[in-house]
Amino acid sequence: KNIGLTPSGDDNGFTQKLVIRKSLLNNTSSVAILKDKSGNTDSLVFARDFIPVPHPLMESANADGQLVFAGYGVDIAGGYSDYKDIDVKGKIVVLINGAPPGLISTLTAHFSNAGNKTTTAFTKGAHGVIIINPLSRGGTNLNPAIQSNTALNPGKTIAYGRGFVGNLKTVLNGTAPLLRKIFLNSGKNMEQVLADLKNGKASSFELPYSIAVSYQTTHTDFVSHNILGLIPGSDPVLKNEYVVHSAHLDHLGIGRVVNGDSIYNGAHDNASGVASLLEIARVYRSSGAKPKRSV
């Protein structure tokens, strides 16, 4: 307000109400069953083979579908694509973590992000995603996605969540033992496929298994707030496009209460970011600059 920004939150104020849903996995309910082309089944072992990402919309998640392998799950327009030779509509996509070689560091980070992998799979029509670390052995080596936080839109749809997007039915974290298991009878050599991917050669194909998954999630909703200030754009058309500068207050969320404060406040992450954000806004206003796009 003192800097002179236009309030852009709820009710013409600076604050915007944000509902965040904490989703907690009931790990005793997690079931995943592989089925081969002959109808033979194999029950996977929770934490050794897989751990579900808690579903932010459904307390009882159920999914089944044909497994397809799509490498890193990357699709770059006019460039590298793990999806160009495979149809994943209605299927469960198996991906490995990481990104193809030869990208600049920011793109490597972008395409390695699990949320971006699941978003791409969803846009291609997949019903579910399994992301596997080929080096993980299961158990303590598998990152346990037992709890996740998701920002919800007013209609209780997903605004942002690390893992789920749209109406994906399931997202699982998997292990190297699971990867070896689903490569059996595929006609593909797992080590060779992984080596090809590491060298930038995409490799995508249908696997000889389907999977059925079910698990339970408990939801707890709580309210947080964004602080929104606007500098309107000067161009009558381009003002409808927005440049966003953002920062966050907490460091690693919340934890044990110390002197009445449970927030993990951080100096560099991210008090310096908030200070920088305020300084950017001050410079915009004090310089007399009139950006064409809204900021």
What residue ranges belong to the model's regions?
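Catalytic-core environment of secreted peptidases
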Residues: 1-7, 24-26, 35-38, 85-87, ...
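Protein/peptide-recognition domains central to ubiquitin and immune signaling
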Residues: 1-48, 131-149, 155, 169-170, ...
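Noncatalytic luminal/extracellular "stalk/propeptide" segments of secretory-pathway proteins
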Residues: 1-93, 97-100, 219, 223-226
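Short Pro/Gly-enriched beta-strand edge/turn motifs at strand-loop
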Residues: 12-17, 206-215
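Extracytoplasmic/secreted envelope proteins and their assembly/folding machinery
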Residues: 15, 80, 115-118, 171, ...
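Second-shell loop/turn segments in exported
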Residues: 19-20, 29-31, 53-58, 69, ...
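Flexible, low-hydrophobicity surface segments
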Residues: 60, 82, 88, 94-162
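Short, well-ordered beta-strand micro-motif
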Residues: 69, 173, 228-232
